[in-house]
Amino acid sequence: MSGERRLNGLSLKVGPLGEHDRLLTLLSDQEGVTRLAVPGARRPRSSLAAAVPLSLLELQVAGRRGLARVRQLKVLRSFNSVGKQLETLAAAQALAELSLMLVAGNDPLPGLLNTLLMHLERLEALSQAQPAQPNTTLACSVQACVHLLALGGYGLPVQECCRNGTALEPPLGQWEWRCSLMPEEGFAIGALPGAALQLNPSELALLQRLLRPDLPMRRDGELMGPPEVWLRLLAVVECWTRTHLPHHMRALGMLRKAIISSGDGRT
């Protein structure tokens, strides 16, 4: 069959297609986001039944016009263990949803797949932590969104004031100082009318540190920031994505509810 090719990528979304097939949405370095038919995947004992969400797959695909079909499938890695905890499941779903929004069709976004896999690995480890660590899960999720948004060209502009270009240098210890999130513009120094929310110096400093590869930790190895601060930073991400991306991210709301229900977050 024409158009035979191999694809390696992460299954972002899987849904029914007809009576026996599945529709697979795959993120790959080669093709960006690709939608594929997986014939017979809903039949019992099908060799293609492993086409499930959040799995790293190696596929043999046939056809380039219309909906290509999966001929062979091999699971390289599964992240289904994130479902052990509601918080890590909601976080993983949010990252998959965000990645899907950031890629324009078949136009690959360099670095997105590897970054997404890195953060899913962190969530996978957290899903197995005993006792559960919902605040760390929340922090990982916020940082992952910050990283993915930056890769997709929607990075949070946390380095300078959107009104006058002054460097955003939070004066730690000056608790009366504020910066305002203006949804269409970015962050502005001062408590301004029309702001979606305001951050104090320590909250802004924490947000700025999320651009680094690792989570901000104290010298004793504990995560910086209490749950209520991480919920505020989640609100920043929610506001920014709602304003600048084409669709509302429902999974972020699910994550917020899961964190609050866990007792490790406060409104």
Curated annotation (Swiss-Prot):
The processes (GO biological process) annotated in the record are: DNA recombination; double-strand break repair
Keyword DNA damage tagged: yes
Q: Where are the transmembrane segments?
A: none
Per the record, what is one GO cellular component? bacterial nucleoid
One Pfam family matching this protein:
RecO_N
> What keywords is this UniProt entry annotated with?
DNA damage, DNA recombination, DNA repair
List, alphabetically, the InterPro entries matched: ARFGAP/RecO (IPR037278), DNA_rep/recomb_RecO_N (IPR022572), NA-bd_OB-fold (IPR012340), RecO (IPR003717), RecO_C (IPR042242)
Query: Any keyword DNA damage?
Result: yes
Instruction: Give the protein family.
Output: Belongs to the RecO family.
Q: What does this protein do?
A: Involved in DNA repair and RecF pathway recombination.
The protein's name? DNA repair protein RecO
Please spell out the taxonomic lineage of the organism that makes this protein.
Answer: Bacteria, Bacillati, Cyanobacteriota, Cyanophyceae, Synechococcales
